[in-house]
Amino acid sequence: MTELFAYLKDGRISDIIGALKCIYGKDALSTLDVHTKLTALCLTLGLDFNEFDRLIVENSPVLRPVKGIAFEVAFQRILESVRVPVQDVGGDGDVDLIINGHHAQLKTPNLGGCKGDVLEYKTHKTHGAKSEKESLSYYHSIESFADFFVGLISYRPFRVFVVPKDMLERVQKDSSRIKSPFKLNASGSCYVNRFDLLGVNLDNADFSSIYATDDDELLPLTSRATGLKTEIIVDTILRECNFRIWDMSIRGFAREIALKKELRAAGIPFVGNPATVRPERGDKSDLAVLNDRSRSHFIQVKGCSVNNCRFDGDMKIATETQLTRGRVNDHPTQSRLYLVSDFDYLALCIDPPISNRIGLGAGWAFCLIPSSELRRHAKYGNRYASMQTFSKNDILRFRVGCRGLIQALLES
């Protein structure tokens, strides 16, 4: 698959899907074997199958959405096995699948809220208001919600709730909105496996098409964690309507894995949880590296903010130097802006497709940028600006390999 990088632009999931279609034809996603599709994903990240497998299972911000959306893919596969017309919608809306013309919202249980046969599900919106305190729009309105709620109970045996939206529990303060989280009791419920409400008969469905096998999985850890075949996992990631799994989650964790791999190759000792070295704000850096004089250097790992980059002409590489959540202010705990004392170096990890695009080769490129080179916030001078930009010359100046890492970190 050496031609893959000729079609990849920025390495987003839409680019990978487009590349596979260019190489193998427009029906590539449905006709290609799982090994070829997984190879494309791993080549894009410069990881092998085992590294990719561990990336998913060892990082809950990745595993959690993979589990949720894999349920949608698995249920769709089961429905298609008995020729039920089904359309995947996905994304951030109120509808995940359209089944026999019925709109359905699919959810996996929130395990922390489950006990025995009583299962808890969260249906609140993941974008917009962050809680009921901020706005009741945090909850879905009954009017806009899907016709049916489909909640996973178990894969083996395959059991789900199929509940008409009018029967879902409402918010106490506003009966026009659906409560989240809410609980359903699988013991004696009249809504367990009520596929007839969707106009569906699954008596002859092929449930084995989704189940993981013990000895034959390319992603054995993830398959074990989800109970699903590697093929279902890979197709979940290659679902463009749920691009956030790859673009905003998997790629971010891949950068840390790639950098740690480089550090190990260079023989540089590091701590993966800097809070154990520096309790106060240690969590605002990603790695702590110990030099020859027993001094810790704190490193913040970032990637390219593709939408803010310019790759052609007068090249500009941009990266966000701010936390995922919070507000732009100087509050000691609620600000999303980093303090200038939070880390000593910014490790800009440039993904293989972008590295290839800007002439640095089809592998990871690492830039180790001293914090003194970063721009400060215009209003809050004790914090870094939200966005940092670098020219091609800057990238070449700060780019380091194993030797550079040793010199910069161990001798500084």
Annotated model-derived regions:
Residues 1-99, 107-284, 290-297, 303-412:
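Nucleic-acid endonuclease domains
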